[in-house]
Structures are given as C-alpha cells and as structure tokens.
C-alpha cells in the first residue's frame, strides 16, 4: 500500500525487446545476451537503412517471439552472418560481447587480406591443381556470378605471367585465386601493392569466410586464433 512506483522485470521499447523478455510471466530478467539480441536488431536497422529484421507493425513482436526474421535488405554476407548470430532466439546461442567484437565484420582490410592468405595456405588451396571435384563444385556454387569469377583475366597481365609459371599455371577458380594470394604475399612482396585484392574482388572475403565456416575450416588450429581478440577480453 502507498507504493508509487511499480518495478517490472520486462522493460523496453515495443519491437526492441529480446525474445525472452516478451513473456513477463517467465520471470527472466535482462542479461548481456538480451542486450546482444537487441543490438543485433539495431545493427540490421542501421545497415539496412531503416528496416527491422522481425518486420513491422503488430506482427513484429510475434515474429521476435517465434524467431521469424528476414535479412533481405542487407547484401553484406559477413554482416548478415553476425546479425543472424546476434538475434538468435536462444540466448545461449548468441555471441558474447567479446565474440561480437572479434567477428570478421569488424576486421580491418589488412586482417581480411591476411585471413585470405592463411586460407590459401591450407591443404585444399595448396592442392588447387588437383583439388577434390566435390569441393570444387561446392566452391563454384559459392563463386557463381561473383566478382572473382574468371579472376585471372582481371589480374594485371604482367603480374599474372610472373606468378603463373610455365609448367604449373594457377587454375582459374577460387582455390587457384587463394593460392595466388598466398604466394603473392609470401614470395613476391615487392608486387603486393600492384593489386588491391579487396577492391578488385569485393565479395571474395565474405564468400570464403562463409564457406570456410560451413566446412569448419575456421575451427582448425591454424585458423581459429583469428576469431579471438585478446584486447577485448
């Protein structure tokens, strides 16, 4: 009696609340994972130019509760990968703040190129001239209609001739390109500045990252350290 303020567990602006806080009877309060889901919604809103991943109007909170979303207004595959992780309906499956900051979406260009070089050093790229047909087919599907299709014709002819060699030319596919990047940075340092890989092939990093994630290459000891940031722990 005489209470002038009512404290509730659930708070927040309509359509900007995490799934677990929509059900006030659940007794679940706000946690870091709650903030992560809302941050994912906001990230999509900003990148997409004003769209909500769970829709709008009366259906928005229902979609949040049911985990129904769309990321159709964002083209960046790396951004979508992070947003999808952040807005997962299961709080336990969302990234931590540290995971979020370490995600490739926030990597500078130098780190992205270095990652491609590291992928080019993996056994699959090393054996690009005798690659498994199934792997090549899967990569071809990923590379279809991408900027790096027929990549050899887009590299400066003098540089391509220099690296190609007479006996072992690079195959004109994604594995061949990754091996080319690796060898360029390993053995032809003086020529590295003559080609801007990320500008020439803007969708290469996203395609390779998503493919490597799907194939669990990123979990290998040679690559997994790239997905941690000691400075934010």
Describe each PLM feature range.
Residues 62-74:
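Short proline-rich PxxP-based motifs
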Residues 112-233:
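Regulatory extensions appended to serine/threonine kinase catalytic cores
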Residues 89-113:
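Terminal C-lobe "cap" of eukaryotic-type protein kinase domains
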Residues 46-47:
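Hydrophobic anchor on a C-lobe helix of Hanks-type protein kinase catalytic domains
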Residues 20-33:
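Conserved end of the kinase activation segment
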Residues 1-16:
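Activation segment/activation loop of eukaryotic-type protein kinase catalytic domains
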Residues 74-88:
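Conserved C-terminal C-lobe helix
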